């Protein structure tokens, strides 16, 4: 399935039904009073969060959503039927923003949480509504009102509690594949991962914790370079960031600084999040080098540095224990 995390759509609520002009014409009431009914309300457009969805793909080609119009009134003071509301299902974590003003209209983070965006137009009045002592046979009616029209941007921000970040080829996908049931594409070259991968990791108490492998972070990501800018938003909701560094990289310290700088430039509180610094692929370096580079990283980051081998599943228990302590 294609991963789409942004979509601009137009939401059009239904028009209210018109009122009608009608008079009672019964067998023994040849000159009855006004009986024209009111029109029904137009349908509204409602967004609803759904746990079963993980992408905004449905809105890639369907950019205009139109709710049903209300029906016109009927004789004998019968009101027209209201238009059916249109309910659009979106993934949990979808933020809705008014494109014209930039104002955030809502943030749907829980299953079945809903938000009415475009409200249907009110139905018009039939002539029975205008009956008065001064006018016993009104012939006035009103048309239904137009429904609201909104142009909105949908932006999906994943609801993972733990975000795995790092330069391409640091081993993020391998890590999420060995600690969860996720099965991302893995290969020994940069940019294998082109979309965020999600995996549920079971804690000791049996409860699940959602991890996300965030792809494409390189120098300049916060400014739109590479793939990273599109995906940095997905770590805004995380509680903890696991910063994975390739132990066999040419300069692991420089790699660490690149990601830290991108978090700082992007802003939005990313640099304030709890971060666990992890050296990966330790099976490919000797012990002396590992001790030296770990110490330098600790001095640079002012944080404890964990060492793991995702491929050999070494050090993973210590890493997960550290994660559970901080959630």
UniProtKB/Swiss-Prot annotation:
InterPro entries, alphabetized: G_OBG (IPR031167), GTP-bd (IPR006073), GTP-bd_Obg/CgtA (IPR014100), GTP1_OBG_dom (IPR006169), GTP1_OBG_dom_sf (IPR036726), OBG_GTPase (IPR045086), P-loop_NTPase (IPR027417)
HAMAP family: GTPase_Obg
Ranges of residues in domain OBG-type G: 160-327
CDD domains xref list: Obg
Major localization listed first in the record, in broad terms: cytoplasm
Top-level lineage group: Bacteria
Subunit record text: Monomer.
Cofactor field: Mg(2+)
Annotated binding of Mg(2+), by residue: 173, 193
GO cellular component, one term: cytoplasm
Biological process, per Gene Ontology: ribosome biogenesis
Subcellular location(s) of the protein: Cytoplasm
UniProt keyword Metal-binding present: yes
Family label: Belongs to the TRAFAC class OBG-HflX-like GTPase superfamily. OBG GTPase family.
Signal peptide: none
Role summary: An essential GTPase which binds GTP, GDP and possibly (p)ppGpp with moderate affinity, with high nucleotide exchange rates and a fairly low GTP hydrolysis rate. Plays a role in control of the cell cycle, stress response, ribosome biogenesis and in those bacteria that undergo differentiation, in morphogenesis control.
Presence of the UniProt keyword NADP in the record: no
One Gene Ontology molecular-function label: magnesium ion binding
Gene assigned in the entry: obg
Keyword terms, alphabetized: ATP-binding, Cytoplasm, GTP-binding, Hydrolase, Magnesium, Metal-binding, Nucleotide-binding
Binding site for ATP: 166-173, 191-195, 213-216, 280-283, 309-311
Entry EC no(s): 3.6.5.-
Name of the protein described by the UniProt record: GTPase Obg
Residues of the Obg domain: 1-159
């Amino acid at each position: 399935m294609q991963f789409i995390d942004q979509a601009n759509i137009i939401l059009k609520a239904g028009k209210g039904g018109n009122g009608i002009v009608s008079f009672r014409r019964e067998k023994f009431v040849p000159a009855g009073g006004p009986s024209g009914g009111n029109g029904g309300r137009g349908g509204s457009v409602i967004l609803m969060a759904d746990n079963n969805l993980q992408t905004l793909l449905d809105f890639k080609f369907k950019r205009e959503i139109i709710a049903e119009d209300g029906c016109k009134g009927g004789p004998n003071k019968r009101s027209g039927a209201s238009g059916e509301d249109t309910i659009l299902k979106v993934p949990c974590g979808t933020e809705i923003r008014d494109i014209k003003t930039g104002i955030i209209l809502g943030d749907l983070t829980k299953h079945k949480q809903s938000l009415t965006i475009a409200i249907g137009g009110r139905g018009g009045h039939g002539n029975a509504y205008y009956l008065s002592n001064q006018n016993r046979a009104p012939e006035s009616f009103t048309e239904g009102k137009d429904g609201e029209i909104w142009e909105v941007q949908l932006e999906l921000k994943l609801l993972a509690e733990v975000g795995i970040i790092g330069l391409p080829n640091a081993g993020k996908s391998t890590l999420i594949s060995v600690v969860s049931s996720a099965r991302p594409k893995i290969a020994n070259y940069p940019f294998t991962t082109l979309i965020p991968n999600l995996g549920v990791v079971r804690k000791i108490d049996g409860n699940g914790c959602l991890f996300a492998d965030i792809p494409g972070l390189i120098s300049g990501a916060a400014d739109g370079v590479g793939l990273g800018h599109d995906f940095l938003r997905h770590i805004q909701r995380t509680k903890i960031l696991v910063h994975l560094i390739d132990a066999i990289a040419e300069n692991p310290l420089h790699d660490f600084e690149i990601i830290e700088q991108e978090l700082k430039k992007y802003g939005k509180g990313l640099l304030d999040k709890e971060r666990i610094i992890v050296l990966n692929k330790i099976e490919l370096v000797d012990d002396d080098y590992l001790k030296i580079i770990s110490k330098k990283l600790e001095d640079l980051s002012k944080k404890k540095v964990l060492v793991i081998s995702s491929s050999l599943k070494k050090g993973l228990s210590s890493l997960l224990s550290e994660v559970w302590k901080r959630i």
